[in-house]
Amino acid sequence: MHNTQKNIHKRRIIIQKICVFILVKGKKRLYTKDYKQNSSIPTEHSIERKQRIERIMIKAGIIGATGYAGGELVRILMGHKDVEIKWYGSRSYIDQKYAAVYQNMVQIVEDVCKDDNMEELADQVDVIFTATPQGFCASLLNEDILSKVKVIDLSADFRIKDQNVYEEWYKIEHKSPQFLPEAVYGLCEINREQIKGARILANPGCYPTCSILSIYPLAKEGLIDMNTLIIDAKSGTSGAGRGAKVDNLYCEVNENIKAYGVASHRHTPEIEEQL
């Protein structure tokens, strides 16, 4: 047992000596030392890291970064190797540190929250995400903005092609109907090629995503009668946003479930249009 422990200790020392940091021209690079050949070669990790530094990053701006959807979007983009977030937009927390709103971002995000000036933002980034209530993105969008950036909207403003259907279900006037024909429904499993060249992407809703991905393959092959579909889906209360509502309080929803929007949910036309 004693010899085994000594051998393990020796192996650890050898491993520690194999990986050494060498400072080259002020840059830290990870090298693997080959003592038999008495030469140094870059590891796969060091090469990948250097390539990432030299790669042109996609600059992203988020309007509505402090909502639940916006917060999750920040988390996902922070882990994307090709994306750099340049703008954390929030009407409610202007000039406050983003990490003060989401404390899990302390020492990760040092930026302060900015306003929702989409025109100013379009001059600074490559893509704009709008994680905002229905009607907001459509009210700000114009041709000048779209000539500079791509826009990915997380609301329903560009999910439905028919303006009248949108206004009937969402009870608001659509402010940019001229852009509806070119908007692409952002479900990459179905519209991958169209998404690549789109200026406007409509991020799918929660119920439509789970419903369409389940049904589309069967519908495409004609294996089901579309008139017999019944969608029984469940959603967490985070989907209702951060706004304070009695129906969403902990004591109301804990260990509970309730039906809502039965046969009248506003995601219905979105699902019907895509299928």
Task: Describe the predicted segments one by one.
Residues H9, I13-Q16, V20-I22, K27, ...:
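Short, positively charged and aromatic/hydrophobic N-terminal segments
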Residues R55-Y260:
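N-terminal Rossmann-like NAD(P) cofactor-binding subdomain of oxidoreductases
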Residues S264-L275:
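Oxyanion-binding "anion nests"
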